[in-house]
Amino acid sequence: MLVPKRVKHRREFRGKMRGEAKGGKEVSFGEYGLQATTSHWITNRQIEAARIAMTRYMKRGGKVWIKIFPHKSYTAKAIGVRMGSGKGAPEGWVAPVKRGKVMFEIAGVSEEVAREALRLASHKLPVKSKFVKREAE
């Protein structure tokens, strides 16, 4: 699973998810991509589940690029603990994804296979997404 090797601060502020993604809005490595149409936090487990769904459907053919990384920690208090007494313990890692960001890219397979693989991956993610092709240069 994807986790940072080391971080400067264990507990981060939640931050705001305003507007569109600044960069990474075009397919740059592969031929086809999965672009987010809504903003959300995506956990490292969801990224891994989407990756497995894609690679299993493609029968280990083609190449997959994961263009998001869960660098932000989120915290949670234990169940049954009263409010107050500081921030909770780090619970997991998330990748904040804004709308417009291309999350996954695929190359080396036909468009039909890529479309279905990315559709299966999109069911594992909490964001609405669409299939995009590389722009002709």
From Swiss-Prot:
GO cellular component: cytosolic large ribosomal subunit
Any one GO molecular-function label of the UniProt entry: rRNA binding
UniProt KW Magnesium keyword: no
A Pfam family the protein falls into: Ribosomal_L16
Keywords: Ribonucleoprotein, Ribosomal protein, RNA-binding, rRNA-binding, tRNA-binding
GO aspect biological process, one term: translation
Gene3D superfamilies the record matches: Ribosomal protein L10e/L16 (3.90.1170.10)
Record-stated family: Belongs to the universal ribosomal protein uL16 family.
Function: Binds 23S rRNA and is also seen to make contacts with the A and possibly P site tRNAs.
Subunit note: Part of the 50S ribosomal subunit.
Protein name as annotated: Large ribosomal subunit protein uL16
UniProt organism field: Streptococcus thermophilus (strain ATCC BAA-491 / LMD-9)
Organismal lineage: Bacteria, Bacillati, Bacillota, Bacilli, Lactobacillales
